């Protein structure tokens, strides 16, 4: 008998609609899903935490509690990025411990824990803490293909995870690269050499996943990850209903009720209709190019979202071609959060700036320095030269060993900002300090769900007005203007002005590193922008003096906005 892990509330919607499903769409069907008999339901972790506060104006902790209240029989599962938790950097051990404890208290029964580089040192603290609180731990192995990845390596990794106390092993095939026969060999070897249950997680991006599931089940896989059909296929998982029928009447029969699954499917068809404008054609089709570019499902939908945000969706093909080049430069990391974000964002910047590594993200710098762990293969020497100072070498210890405790510090900061109502708020602030302050103060609004535009309806906006001021009438004509203007104190600053420094992309100002009157050299970091979930240092294009600073920390800027005048 094969068991099914349901991913509809987490990875499925993350892969297809960039994690925009609201809690209000989950709760009405949660109790019925609890009746199905899934091995577990993956409902939290991954990008859901970030999306809740950044886009949906929802408290992710409250979502978890609400789901736990309605799902009493099925274990709730989350995806935890090891030392990265649900963020995009390494957090110190005290934050990791506190997060795991609180996640368990709020309803998580099973922690699926992975490290993007398969560096088990980055999984140690999370595994130990989850075991300590009595949760089930599933150690996940990120599957990828490259000149340096082999079945033998994956088997050795699984043995290490078994020794560390994991209760089961997950083959996490985030890009849909696992072929049916390679999957068969991998699972067969694992069943021969370790004694833990095996779960296989894949995506349909390349079209291989349903076939691969049948072969890994034949090889002895105990569980497979599936999604209810309206949120299946494309960059998501295989459909639950199809897998249930495929195995019916065999020794692998799941025992799940197809009638009940179809009732759940009918509900999600309505949910799908609500979000239909978020379903990108790119993430819904089978795209065998993934076998070349190795872009995971969640990364693909986020890539589309990021390029739309930057007004550069026409660069999609170029970015797809750049991703494998950046991945090779970085030593072939598996493309899963946060490395998918690190590689993907750097590839986007390389294309948008029309020069490779003209802007290098802080995350790439930290990755190259070893702060994310040990890469599977050596990093491109040219990139090492650009990132490392003379005589500097990447670290070789467990990255978290270099991180001082943060809990007391972030607790004090959060309390001073007046944003703490419960202990979980401190963790939210620790993970996402910039966005959390606005969220916890109630300053954010949920982004609207895109609606289908009325076809054929033309909205006419007048372009000429008569304006009366103190009895005198003026004729005003409004025309679209190419380029970006930023008005400050009744004057207009344009990108054409001498010394104007413009934003290379759309984002939020997180740090201003200079003051008016400061002298800067070409290449000095003047501003840090957060865009595409990463922080990007913006360098001065010239040597000179900072005459004007036209932005404040927390401001949103668009591509081409003038942010400073440096002469």
Swiss-Prot record:
Optimum temperature is 80-90 degrees Celsius. The modification N6-carboxylysine is found at residue 172. Inhibited by magnesium, when its concentration exceeded the ATP one, and by high concentration of ATP and alpha-ketoglutarate. Residues 2-262 form the Pyruvate carboxyltransferase domain. A divalent metal cation binds at residues 11, 172, 201, 203. It is an enzyme of class 6 (ligase). Residues 492-567 form the Biotinyl-binding domain. Coiled coil: none annotated. This is Pyruvate carboxylase subunit B. It comes from Methanocaldococcus jannaschii (strain ATCC 43067 / DSM 2661 / JAL-1 / JCM 10045 / NBRC 100440). The lineage of its organism: Archaea, Methanobacteriati, Methanobacteriota, Methanomada group, Methanococci. The gene is pycB.
